[in-house]
Amino acid sequence: MIKGILLSLSASVLFGYLYYFSTLLQPLGGEDIFGFRIIFTLPFVIAAVFLFKQKQAVGQYFVRIKQQPLLIFGFLFNSAMMGIQIWLFLWAPNNGSALSVSFGYLLLPLTMVLVGRLVFKEHISRVKFLAVVIAAIGVFSNILLKGGLSWEALLVSFGYSTYFATRKILKINDLAGFCLEMSLLLPVCIYFAWQVDLQAVQQANENILLLLVLLGLISGVALNTYIVASSLLPINVLGLLGYAEPIMMLFVSFLIGEQLDSETIPLFICLMISMILFMSEGLVRLKRRYK
């Protein structure tokens, strides 16, 4: 298990570093970085399909699509949802929205709990219910003080929840399904990358070509590291370690100069308390399981 924990934490650190890495790719815009990231990351995802013996699962999806043609719309929807999230992740640090997106990732486990309860009738423990209530208080305070949550935080928390729920409903929540979803993004990403005048960009950032290759390399290594970790760890441990990424994102947000305004502090405190409650419950369950 130690190996899995180290791999999961390494993946979170790499994903957190990607949040910062996009600031090194200026003057490229969010769409440009998004296009290049998918182009350079997809080969790693395809390699993972072969490495983890998911080739047959990919073929089975094509059989399902042939039998159920409407399933292709599910893949297209999920592909679009995933693409929006990846774009937002890369766009935010260069546009003053790094903290807002980080808040969205902190809210995500709470919205996932609500989706699990409302859509899949999953049980909610008292601790998780308390965490949701505290987060709701933070959200309500933000509505009173600022008129509502930022669109970035809402897009992350509810967008990703919808994405994961749709994958579960359609039974495409595996590596093979992820590979097909990312592959469907390729035409759009090629278009975005094709529009970039790399010669002009190189005049402003002479290392841009090397940085773009590193973008794909870091993304691919982070993704495959996470996949390996997920195969070594129980799902509850993996979920608990998943909090490392939003913490890294918060750190990056402060590192690049973003600051909390006074109206947002109550939301921040409530989300941190909720996160601590989630993590505490997870640790208690792990202790009981391996006692």
Curated annotation (Swiss-Prot):
It is a multi-pass membrane protein. InterPro entries: EamA_dom (IPR000620), RarD (IPR004626). It comes from the Bacteria. SUPFAM superfamilies: Multidrug resistance efflux transporter EmrE. Signal peptide: none annotated. Its main location: membrane. GO terms for cellular component: plasma membrane. It is found in: Cell membrane. Belongs to the EamA transporter family. This is Uncharacterized transporter PM1281.
